Design a protein with these regions (language model features):
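Short, hydrophobic secondary-structure boundary micro-motifs
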Residues: 22, 95-99, 144, 169-173
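Short, structured helix-loop boundary elements
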Residues: 2, 23, 45, 49, ...
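Amphipathic alpha-helical segments used for helix-helix packing
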Residues: 90-111, 162-166
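Helix-turn-helix
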Residues: 4, 12-46, 50
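Hydrophobic alpha-helical connector segments
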Residues: 50, 54, 64-94, 149-153
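Amphipathic alpha-helical packing segments from all-alpha helical-bundle domains
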Residues: 57, 64, 109-138, 147-151, ...
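Generic hydrophobic, amphipathic alpha-helix propensity
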Residues: 1-9, 26, 51-59, 63, ...
Length: 192
């Protein structure tokens, strides 16, 4: 039944977006009673956490494949950035649910749920940090605090992706993707 609930929530997420998800709509979509859903999940945020983990797992698998390629470490970071950009466009609903957790100004999850969310995203930061660490060992990069750089790199990518919404206003006559690529190049250059 847990899978049935997540299938219904995923269907709603992909067909109507994050705002459309409610326990009553999940109940209707899954053909399960509201009480049954509450038996498995305390609230819709717990369902969001499960969907967020799916999205992060998918994104992680893409980034992991890039991290294992036998290419220059700077090129790995470029490809990771491009993969995240592509993910934000092609897996928009998963990106939206990941963003739901990152952009909320308040933490409204119980500590255990918050920890689950944070740990699922931490895996990606560890991959980036490992690439930078390896690049330092090979003399490609020069960075003293690889953890901070990895957080800055990922946070910058995430923020830049959100600037796509400004394409018709602030970024008028600018290609968002070119601005994104330019920024990634500058970030990587900063540690060479």
């Amino acid at each position: 039944r847990r899978d049935q609930i997540l299938d219904a929530a995923r269907t709603l997420l992909f067909s109507s977006g994050l705002e459309s998800i409610s326990i009553s709509r999940i109940s209707k979509q899954s053909e399960l009673g509201v009480g049954t859903i509450y038996f498995y999940y305390k609230n819709k945020e717990e369902i969001f956490v499960a969907l967020q983990k799916e999205g992060v797992t998918l994104l992680y698998s893409i980034i992991f494949q890039i991290s294992k390629k036998d290419i220059d470490h700077g090129e790995k970071l470029i490809r990771i950035a491009k993969a995240y950009y592509k993910f934000s466009q092609e897996q928009k609903h998963y990106f939206d649910i990941i963003n739901y957790f990152l952009s909320s100004p308040i933490v409204f999850f119980e500590p255990d749920l918050k920890n689950q969310i944070d740990m699922s995203g931490r895996k990606i930061l560890v991959l980036i940090k490992d690439i930078v660490d390896e690049g330092i060992q090979k003399g490609v990069f020069n960075e003293k605090d690889t953890k901070k750089f990895s957080i800055m790199f990922w946070g910058t990518l995430h923020g830049l992706i959100h600037f796509k919404k400004l394409e018709k206003t602030i970024l008028e006559k600018e290609s968002h993707e070119k601005l994104f690529d330019y920024s990634v190049q500058k970030l990587i250059h900063s540690i060479k």
